[in-house]
Amino acid sequence: DLVMMPLETADITRLEAEGWNAPEVFVAKGRDGKTDMWGLIARPTNFDPNKKYPVIEYIYQGPGDQYVPKTFRPYDWNMTSLAELGFIVVMVDGMGTSFRSRAFENVCYKNLKDAGLPDHIAWMKAAARKYPYMDVDRVGIYGCSAGGQESTNAVLLYPDFYKAAYSACGCHDNRMDKIWWNELWLGYPVGDQYKEGSNVENAHLLSRPLMLVVGELDDNVDPASTMQVVNALIKANKDFELVVIPGAHHTMGEAFGEHKRYDFFVRHLMQVNPPKWDEIK
Protein backbone atom coordinates (compact mmCIF):
# COMPACT_ATOMS: atom_id res chain seq x y z
CA ASP A 1 0.00 0.00 0.00
CA LEU A 2 1.10 3.54 -0.75
CA VAL A 3 1.27 5.75 2.32
CA MET A 4 1.64 9.50 2.01
CA MET A 5 2.41 11.79 4.90
CA PRO A 6 3.86 15.30 5.30
CA LEU A 7 7.47 15.36 6.43
CA GLU A 8 7.51 19.03 7.33
CA THR A 9 5.41 22.14 6.93
CA ALA A 10 6.77 25.64 6.44
CA ASP A 11 5.66 28.22 8.96
CA ILE A 12 5.07 31.53 7.17
CA THR A 13 3.00 33.18 9.90
CA ARG A 14 5.69 35.77 10.63
CA LEU A 15 5.83 36.75 6.95
CA GLU A 16 2.05 37.00 6.79
CA ALA A 17 1.99 39.03 10.00
CA GLU A 18 4.17 41.60 8.23
CA GLY A 19 1.61 41.84 5.43
CA TRP A 20 3.38 39.58 2.95
CA ASN A 21 1.21 37.88 0.34
CA ALA A 22 2.31 35.09 -1.96
CA PRO A 23 2.39 35.97 -5.67
CA GLU A 24 -0.68 34.86 -7.60
CA VAL A 25 -0.33 32.02 -10.09
CA PHE A 26 -1.92 33.27 -13.31
CA VAL A 27 -2.53 31.39 -16.55
CA ALA A 28 -3.50 32.84 -19.93
CA LYS A 29 -3.22 31.92 -23.59
CA GLY A 30 -0.05 32.68 -25.51
CA ARG A 31 0.53 34.07 -28.98
CA ASP A 32 -1.41 31.28 -30.70
CA GLY A 33 -4.55 31.87 -28.65
CA LYS A 34 -4.58 28.21 -27.62
CA THR A 35 -1.57 27.32 -25.48
CA ASP A 36 -1.57 28.05 -21.75
CA MET A 37 1.24 30.22 -20.39
CA TRP A 38 1.87 30.14 -16.66
CA GLY A 39 3.30 32.93 -14.57
CA LEU A 40 3.27 34.86 -11.30
CA ILE A 41 1.84 38.23 -10.32
CA ALA A 42 3.34 39.99 -7.28
CA ARG A 43 1.53 42.95 -5.70
CA PRO A 44 2.63 45.44 -3.03
CA THR A 45 1.48 44.81 0.52
CA ASN A 46 -0.49 48.08 0.49
CA PHE A 47 -2.19 47.09 -2.77
CA ASP A 48 -5.31 49.07 -3.70
CA PRO A 49 -7.38 47.69 -6.62
CA ASN A 50 -8.74 51.18 -7.29
CA LYS A 51 -5.29 52.47 -8.28
CA LYS A 52 -3.35 51.97 -11.52
CA TYR A 53 0.04 50.29 -11.21
CA PRO A 54 2.91 50.21 -13.70
CA VAL A 55 3.99 46.66 -14.53
CA ILE A 56 7.54 45.30 -14.41
CA GLU A 57 8.49 41.93 -15.85
CA TYR A 58 11.40 39.91 -14.52
CA ILE A 59 12.60 37.80 -17.45
CA TYR A 60 14.78 34.74 -17.68
CA GLN A 61 13.62 32.74 -20.65
CA GLY A 62 16.72 30.60 -20.93
CA PRO A 63 16.22 28.32 -22.76
CA GLY A 64 16.92 24.94 -21.17
CA ASP A 65 14.51 24.84 -18.23
CA GLN A 66 11.32 26.23 -16.72
CA TYR A 67 12.02 29.39 -14.75
CA VAL A 68 8.85 30.61 -13.07
CA PRO A 69 9.13 29.27 -9.48
CA LYS A 70 7.04 26.18 -8.83
CA THR A 71 7.90 26.00 -5.13
CA PHE A 72 7.63 28.38 -2.20
CA ARG A 73 10.00 31.32 -2.48
CA PRO A 74 9.50 34.41 -0.35
CA TYR A 75 12.10 36.32 -2.37
CA ASP A 76 12.84 35.91 -6.06
CA TRP A 77 15.32 38.35 -7.62
CA ASN A 78 13.71 41.06 -5.48
CA MET A 79 10.35 40.87 -7.27
CA THR A 80 8.54 41.47 -3.98
CA SER A 81 10.83 44.34 -2.98
CA LEU A 82 10.29 46.00 -6.35
CA ALA A 83 6.53 45.59 -5.95
CA GLU A 84 6.71 47.44 -2.62
CA LEU A 85 7.67 50.60 -4.52
CA GLY A 86 4.23 50.60 -6.12
CA PHE A 87 4.57 48.22 -9.06
CA ILE A 88 2.93 45.01 -10.18
CA VAL A 89 5.83 42.62 -10.85
CA VAL A 90 5.37 39.55 -13.03
CA MET A 91 7.24 36.58 -14.41
CA VAL A 92 6.07 34.14 -17.10
CA ASP A 93 7.45 31.15 -19.01
CA GLY A 94 6.78 31.57 -22.72
CA MET A 95 7.29 29.26 -25.68
CA GLY A 96 10.91 28.16 -25.91
CA THR A 97 11.18 27.05 -22.29
CA SER A 98 11.44 23.36 -21.43
CA PHE A 99 9.35 20.48 -20.07
CA ARG A 100 6.09 21.26 -21.88
CA SER A 101 6.53 19.56 -25.26
CA ARG A 102 9.15 19.32 -27.96
CA ALA A 103 7.18 21.68 -30.19
CA PHE A 104 6.83 24.18 -27.33
CA GLU A 105 10.58 24.20 -26.67
CA ASN A 106 11.60 24.13 -30.33
CA VAL A 107 10.19 27.61 -30.84
CA CYS A 108 13.58 28.82 -29.60
CA TYR A 109 15.70 26.63 -31.90
CA LYS A 110 17.71 28.88 -34.20
CA ASN A 111 15.41 31.61 -32.89
CA LEU A 112 16.71 33.01 -29.58
CA LYS A 113 15.63 36.40 -30.91
CA ASP A 114 12.06 35.33 -30.07
CA ALA A 115 12.72 35.04 -26.30
CA GLY A 116 9.10 34.04 -25.75
CA LEU A 117 8.22 37.73 -25.79
CA PRO A 118 5.07 37.41 -27.95
CA ASP A 119 3.70 35.03 -25.30
CA HIS A 120 4.74 37.29 -22.43
CA ILE A 121 2.98 40.25 -24.05
CA ALA A 122 -0.21 38.24 -24.69
CA TRP A 123 -0.14 36.97 -21.09
CA MET A 124 0.24 40.46 -19.60
CA LYS A 125 -2.52 41.87 -21.79
CA ALA A 126 -4.81 39.05 -20.63
CA ALA A 127 -3.89 39.76 -17.00
CA ALA A 128 -4.69 43.45 -17.52
CA ARG A 129 -8.11 42.59 -18.95
CA LYS A 130 -8.88 40.66 -15.76
CA TYR A 131 -7.14 43.16 -13.48
CA PRO A 132 -7.62 46.69 -14.88
CA TYR A 133 -5.30 48.11 -12.21
CA MET A 134 -2.40 46.66 -14.22
CA ASP A 135 -1.32 49.51 -16.50
CA VAL A 136 0.16 47.80 -19.55
CA ASP A 137 0.84 51.18 -21.12
CA ARG A 138 3.68 51.44 -18.57
CA VAL A 139 5.64 48.18 -18.71
CA GLY A 140 9.29 47.78 -17.77
CA ILE A 141 11.48 44.69 -17.93
CA TYR A 142 14.67 43.50 -16.24
CA GLY A 143 16.90 40.44 -16.32
CA CYS A 144 20.42 39.11 -15.97
CA SER A 145 22.60 36.96 -18.25
CA ALA A 146 20.22 35.48 -20.85
CA GLY A 147 17.64 37.71 -19.18
CA GLY A 148 19.94 40.66 -19.77
CA GLN A 149 20.00 39.85 -23.46
CA GLU A 150 16.23 39.30 -23.52
CA SER A 151 15.34 42.49 -21.66
CA THR A 152 17.41 44.61 -24.05
CA ASN A 153 15.90 42.68 -26.95
CA ALA A 154 12.44 43.59 -25.61
CA VAL A 155 12.93 47.36 -25.84
CA LEU A 156 14.73 47.09 -29.18
CA LEU A 157 12.14 44.93 -30.92
CA TYR A 158 8.92 45.60 -28.96
CA PRO A 159 9.17 49.29 -27.97
CA ASP A 160 5.42 49.82 -28.32
CA PHE A 161 4.90 47.51 -25.33
CA TYR A 162 8.10 47.61 -23.26
CA LYS A 163 8.88 51.17 -22.18
CA ALA A 164 12.12 50.68 -20.18
CA ALA A 165 14.71 47.95 -19.61
CA TYR A 166 17.37 47.18 -17.00
CA SER A 167 19.78 44.62 -18.43
CA ALA A 168 22.57 43.05 -16.38
CA CYS A 169 25.51 41.00 -17.70
CA GLY A 170 23.71 40.14 -20.92
CA CYS A 171 25.05 37.72 -23.52
CA HIS A 172 24.06 40.30 -26.10
CA ASP A 173 25.58 38.60 -29.13
CA ASN A 174 25.60 34.81 -29.23
CA ARG A 175 28.55 34.80 -31.62
CA MET A 176 30.90 35.73 -28.77
CA ASP A 177 29.40 33.86 -25.83
CA LYS A 178 30.05 30.25 -24.73
CA ILE A 179 30.27 28.14 -27.90
CA TRP A 180 28.73 24.97 -26.46
CA TRP A 181 25.64 26.77 -25.14
CA ASN A 182 25.00 28.85 -28.22
CA GLU A 183 25.48 26.03 -30.72
CA LEU A 184 23.09 23.91 -28.65
CA TRP A 185 20.25 26.35 -29.35
CA LEU A 186 21.32 28.20 -32.48
CA GLY A 187 23.06 25.40 -34.36
CA TYR A 188 26.17 25.37 -36.51
CA PRO A 189 27.45 26.83 -38.75
CA VAL A 190 27.04 30.39 -37.54
CA GLY A 191 24.42 31.98 -39.77
CA ASP A 192 21.81 34.69 -39.92
CA GLN A 193 20.06 33.27 -36.84
CA TYR A 194 22.97 34.58 -34.75
CA LYS A 195 22.98 38.01 -36.36
CA GLU A 196 19.20 38.50 -36.18
CA GLY A 197 19.15 38.06 -32.41
CA SER A 198 22.17 40.25 -31.72
CA ASN A 199 21.59 43.34 -29.60
CA VAL A 200 24.78 44.71 -31.12
CA GLU A 201 23.30 44.50 -34.61
CA ASN A 202 19.94 45.88 -33.43
CA ALA A 203 21.28 48.61 -31.13
CA HIS A 204 20.35 51.33 -33.63
CA LEU A 205 16.67 50.52 -32.98
CA LEU A 206 16.76 51.79 -29.39
CA SER A 207 13.97 54.26 -28.63
CA ARG A 208 13.28 53.51 -24.95
CA PRO A 209 15.24 54.06 -21.71
CA LEU A 210 17.89 51.38 -21.20
CA MET A 211 20.26 50.77 -18.30
CA LEU A 212 23.11 48.35 -19.02
CA VAL A 213 24.87 46.83 -16.01
CA VAL A 214 28.00 44.67 -16.04
CA GLY A 215 30.35 43.15 -13.49
CA GLU A 216 33.96 44.11 -14.15
CA LEU A 217 35.15 40.54 -13.49
CA ASP A 218 32.25 38.60 -15.01
CA ASP A 219 33.61 35.09 -15.58
CA ASN A 220 30.41 33.71 -17.14
CA VAL A 221 29.60 36.19 -19.90
CA ASP A 222 32.53 38.27 -21.14
CA PRO A 223 32.02 41.95 -20.17
CA ALA A 224 32.97 42.72 -23.76
CA SER A 225 29.49 41.48 -24.68
CA THR A 226 27.99 44.49 -22.93
CA MET A 227 30.70 46.82 -24.19
CA GLN A 228 29.98 45.87 -27.79
CA VAL A 229 26.39 47.01 -27.28
CA VAL A 230 27.66 50.20 -25.63
CA ASN A 231 29.90 50.85 -28.63
CA ALA A 232 27.07 50.23 -31.10
CA LEU A 233 24.72 52.51 -29.17
CA ILE A 234 27.28 55.31 -29.10
CA LYS A 235 27.89 54.95 -32.84
CA ALA A 236 24.12 55.11 -33.39
CA ASN A 237 23.95 58.29 -31.26
CA LYS A 238 21.61 56.66 -28.73
CA ASP A 239 21.11 57.79 -25.15
CA PHE A 240 21.38 55.12 -22.44
CA GLU A 241 22.84 54.46 -18.99
CA LEU A 242 25.85 52.25 -18.17
CA VAL A 243 26.74 50.91 -14.74
CA VAL A 244 30.02 49.00 -14.25
CA ILE A 245 30.41 47.26 -10.88
CA PRO A 246 34.14 47.05 -9.96
CA GLY A 247 35.25 43.63 -8.77
CA ALA A 248 31.83 42.08 -9.43
CA HIS A 249 31.34 38.82 -11.29
CA HIS A 250 28.18 37.57 -13.06
CA THR A 251 25.59 39.64 -11.24
CA MET A 252 22.23 41.36 -11.35
CA GLY A 253 24.10 44.38 -10.01
CA GLU A 254 24.69 43.64 -6.32
CA ALA A 255 23.51 46.22 -3.75
CA PHE A 256 24.49 49.23 -5.87
CA GLY A 257 22.68 47.79 -8.87
CA GLU A 258 19.56 47.25 -6.74
CA HIS A 259 19.51 50.96 -5.95
CA LYS A 260 20.02 51.85 -9.58
CA ARG A 261 17.26 49.49 -10.75
CA TYR A 262 14.71 50.78 -8.25
CA ASP A 263 15.45 54.40 -9.16
CA PHE A 264 15.47 53.65 -12.89
CA PHE A 265 11.95 52.22 -12.92
CA VAL A 266 10.57 54.85 -10.54
CA ARG A 267 11.86 57.58 -12.87
CA HIS A 268 10.77 56.07 -16.14
CA LEU A 269 7.51 54.29 -15.27
CA MET A 270 6.20 56.54 -12.48
CA GLN A 271 7.73 59.81 -13.74
CA VAL A 272 8.93 60.51 -10.19
CA ASN A 273 12.40 61.61 -9.12
CA PRO A 274 13.45 59.29 -6.27
CA PRO A 275 15.28 60.62 -3.20
CA LYS A 276 19.05 60.36 -3.02
CA TRP A 277 20.08 57.11 -1.36
CA ASP A 278 22.72 58.74 0.81
CA GLU A 279 20.04 61.02 2.29
CA ILE A 280 17.68 58.19 3.26
CA LYS A 281 17.79 57.29 6.93
Residue ranges and their predicted role:
Residues 1-281:
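Serine-hydrolase catalytic core recognition
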